[in-house]
Structure formats: structure tokens, C-alpha cells
Amino acid sequence: MIEFILNGQPVRVTEVPEDAPLLWVVREHLKLSGTKFGCGLGLCGACTVHINGEAARSCITPLSVVARQSVTTIEGLDPQHAHPLQRAWIAEQVPQCGYCQSGQIMQAAALLKKVPKPSDAQIVEAMDGNLCRCGTYQRIKIAIHRAAKEAA
């Protein structure tokens, strides 16, 4: 049995191996489908969540790592879907297929928590490894700048 906080609520996971990927626990056992499976190797960023406020790849994070920790998924970033990044994503028309967006937003949220007004270089560095098969990287960067201004 593993207990942790998920999106602000206590969760107890039983009958799941401790080495099961957090991604599968969140999606299959806890029925939160916003976090996506991309590569399964932690290389694409589609599965990004926050563990204690830090961006982490949930596809390679064993469930045991989050015992007594706080995990936030895209569903918990803002229950009203009104986080500055979510609004900026819409305003800047970032999504095309949308598959990578939850991971992109979660990675960007971790960046803005550390660096409230990031430079282009800081954005590029922080977002490196979050892949977008549609190539909307420029719009992602613009949306992050927009969210930073809005949050200030």
C-alpha cells in the first residue's frame, strides 16, 4: 500500500506493485487521463507531473517514489482550468493535436514557479525534452511569456 497526496487529496493505492510506473497508477487506477503516455522512457515529456512542485516524468517514476509525497497532475494544476498557462495556451492557439499539451503545461508551470519572468533562453532550456510532434515550439514560448506577464 502506498499513500500520497494527489491534486491536494489523500490517496491510498493498494494491490498495485510498488515499482509500477506512476503514470499507469494515475491513469488506470485513479482514472485521471490528462497525463499522457508518449514514449515510456521519460524522453518526450508527455507524462510530466509535479512531485512536490518539481516536474517529473511519471512514466519512469515508480509508485514507491511518491509515498508520502505530493503529486499534481494537469487536472490539479487549476481545478477551474484557469491557470495563467492554460489561458495563455488557448489565447496563443498553442494546441494542434494537443497530445503533448498537458506535459508541456506542467513543465512550464514548474519553470514559472522557479523563474517568474523567464528569458527565451531559460524557456528553451526548461522545455528541452518536452517534444511536440506538431512543432508549436514558438507558440509555446510565446504562451509562457504571456502567462508570466499575466501572473505578475
From Swiss-Prot:
[2Fe-2S] cluster binds at residues 39, 44, 47. CDD domains: fer2. It is an enzyme of class 1 (oxidoreductase). It catalyses: isoquinoline + A + H2O = isoquinolin-1(2H)-one + AH2. Its EC number is 1.3.99.16. The keyword Hydrolase does not apply. It comes from the Bacteria. One of its GO terms (molecular function) is isoquinoline 1-oxidoreductase activity. Keywords: 2Fe-2S, Iron, Iron-sulfur, Metal-binding, Oxidoreductase. Residues 1-77 form the 2Fe-2S ferredoxin-type domain. Specific towards N-containing N-heterocyclic substrates, including isoquinoline, isoquinolin-5-ol, phthalazine and quinazoline. Heterodimer of an alpha chain and a beta chain. This is Isoquinoline 1-oxidoreductase subunit alpha. It comes from Brevundimonas diminuta. The lineage of its organism: Bacteria, Pseudomonadati, Pseudomonadota, Alphaproteobacteria, Caulobacterales.
